[in-house]
Amino acid sequence: MSGIDNLFQEETLLSNIKIAAYFILLYEHFEDVVISTVKEFYAHDCVLNGQLFLSIDDAYIQCLETRIENGEKPCTHLKHSLVSAKRERKIYKKEILGSKKNEDAKALRGSLKWLQEHYVISEEENELIFSIRKRRNTLVHELLKEIGNGLDEQDIQMIVKLLKLQQRINAWRVKQIDMPIMEIKLPKEVKPDDVMGGDDAVLESMFRILFCGEGPQFKEALEKESAKLLSKQQR
């Protein structure tokens, strides 16, 4: 199909924009999932000033330092928390980020390596993720050109593979982190690898609406639930 059709034929244009938008959305969320999953093995949740942090977050450490400098009490407890947080952050930076300054890129690369070493993903899948990342960068920085070129089945295949990888990582995370902490046991008929997180369910539903023609079914289900809720409120 020509570039003119890709840009000015409504059906084709909408299809290309849907693929590009979902591709970028999914990749950004996937990267967050990868980094946060590994972080949770090096840190713990903390609440300070009514906000939730991970103990290795720079914002959390800065907040502790500010409160100590202001002489807030109990100062001993705050100092202990600061020492502990800095120790955890140092270990995380050493084992995941390494010595390079570009922490965002290192966090992804180091986290994927960690997941590979713990047999969550394979070496081939690690390489695939960076191919998908490269494609994401092209879409973000040259979107108009790529829409003119047209997005194709290969882009859809990358989306499907990334969805499956994210679901696997999230299922592993639930099994290794959430279930032990919350002391949850799954029913015998449910396999841990089949557990789907809320974000996975949302992203898969969006995929089915956008690319599988299931919009009417979701609309009907939403209307039924809205009617039930309205009926309960009127009682």
Where do the PLM segments sit?
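Polyanionic, low-complexity intrinsically disordered segments
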Residues: 1-92, 109, 113, 124-127, ...
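Acidic, low-complexity proline/glycine-rich segments
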Residues: 97-100
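Short glycine-centered helix-capping/turn motifs at secondary-structure transition points
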Residues: 119-122
